[in-house]
């Protein structure tokens, strides 16, 4: 039986610009659609009628359009070809979005196949804990967001994040919080308490929000103060901006 196709935004090769895998080359598979509307989101909201962009040569931006839904066979063949033609270049496959867990039904069938070629790295907003539980056995590493109200505009997600983290903790995982000048101490305290309540050794990354013109929306001293606050609860807290934006990468 053939695997179901997926509504994708793009498939391409680039360096990871955020989180614990920063600087490593990945195959990015960007799923379309999200369950949240964050104020700082930089991902285009495509519609099902629009084609997916698929890069032909890794990192060269020679995109061609592909009708949605895109088949697993096409994506798997692309990854296999890149692995054969550029051995050792890619560290892993980034399953990103949008929010890929919206299509957990597709992920349950796609991930075992993709994982035959490279480890699977799931980038997620950290809310859909039930969906994570369904695919967790096919994931190697999880980059999870905690959405704080001051920068994301999202509220009342704390319990969802806690439940999500309890499942994510069964894999290698780290957490990212986008912070800005408007971020309040209580937000970092509450997030840090949630993380420490599950596992204080899970790394936390404070990511300065990127504003228009690729400028950072937080003063250095403010970022340091938030880091100092989180370090009261957690063993590893880093400040890392979106480096791919500085390099002109996707």
UniProtKB/Swiss-Prot annotation:
Enzyme Commission no: 4.3.99.3
InterPro entries: 7-CO-7-deazaguanine_synth-like, Aldolase_TIM, rSAM
Chain coiled-coil ranges: none
Signal peptide: none
SUPFAM superfamilies referenced in this protein's UniProt entry, alphabetically: Radical SAM enzymes
Keywords noted in UniProt: 4Fe-4S, Iron, Iron-sulfur, Lyase, Magnesium, Metal-binding, Queuosine biosynthesis, S-adenosyl-L-methionine
Biological processes per GO annotation: queuosine biosynthetic process
Binding site for Mg(2+): 43
Organism expressing this protein natively: Geobacter sulfurreducens (strain ATCC 51573 / DSM 12127 / PCA)
Cofactor(s) this protein cannot do without: [4Fe-4S] cluster; S-adenosyl-L-methionine; Mg(2+)
Homology family: Belongs to the radical SAM superfamily. 7-carboxy-7-deazaguanine synthase family.
UniProt domain Radical SAM core: residue ranges: 21-250
Name under which the protein is recorded: 7-carboxy-7-deazaguanine synthase
Chain residues that bind [4Fe-4S] cluster: 34, 38, 41
The protein's assembly and partners: Homodimer.
